Amino acid sequence: MAAAAAWTGAASPNSLLLSRSPPHAAALAPSPGSSMRRRLLLGVGTPAVAALAAAAPPAVLQDGAVTVLITAGAYSLVRVFDELTERRLIEKSLSRKVVHVLSGVLFMSSWPLFSNSTEARYFAAVVPFLNSMRLLIYGLRLYTDEALELLRGPLYYVLVLLFSVLVFWRESPIGIVSLSMMSGGDGFADIVGRRYGSAKLPFNRKKSWAGSISMFISGFLLSAMMMLYFSSLGYIDVIWEEALGKLALVALAATVVECVPVTEVVDDNISVPLATMLVAFLLFSSNRTIVN
């Protein structure tokens, strides 16, 4: 009504100033077609996405959100230590091993964030799967020693993470112990061995007593801590009087395998978790030490 009054002169001067459009307003006004195109460009799919989110089960939304969060966290972890290495605040070898340790530990620690649905493990598997694709694409593009290294140790590492999620998941102590030995045990063996490994093993001059001892201790402790973590959340039941001794046997077996001079043939990121899985399967699945 105010606009009509403005054009007919029935309104006051103030209302005319407020309501009258400039002479060229009609020329500047978007056509119905351009308005439709603008809505399509700015808001395409928004109602559909909202409807899809509303119709999706809560477990799917939870698992999807956690997957995005963990993927972003994994990428950020690598970027932070890459930046520290570029600024020479940390040695490159130490940076890689710290990422080696933290990646496995933090990834396992994130498993309880996923829902209790049967599909939750597949959402969790997306994280190491994407990382393996990244390593493959980056490694195959380059013809350098660094690229070849990426296609060995780091790629094997994330493939073991992927395998453990799909096969064992959080209800199995076998996967938990295997990843603990691979990430914590093998990682600390290299860190300590490089700094204090002057005394070499007589049958493998590339390994040291300090590194092997640290692998046994750190692998055992991390395995026990992760078992306590998952048992406290109700995923596994542990009889600690029996479990601790068997964890020590698993750690010893993994340490022996890591000491064997076959690195050129089988990478530690494959031999250590495979040996751990085998021994853990024999020890933990044959009696009531751990009841799923």
UniProtKB/Swiss-Prot annotation:
Keywords: Chloroplast, Kinase, Membrane, Plastid, Transferase, Transit peptide, Transmembrane, Transmembrane helix. GO terms for cellular component: chloroplast; chloroplast membrane. Its EC number is 2.7.1.182. It is a multi-pass membrane protein. GO terms for biological process: vitamin E biosynthetic process. The keyword Transit peptide applies. Pathway: Cofactor biosynthesis; tocopherol biosynthesis. Involved in the activation and reutilization of phytol from chlorophyll degradation in plant metabolism, including tocopherol biosynthesis. Catalyzes the conversion of phytol to phytol monophosphate (PMP). This is Probable phytol kinase 2, chloroplastic. It comes from Glycine max.
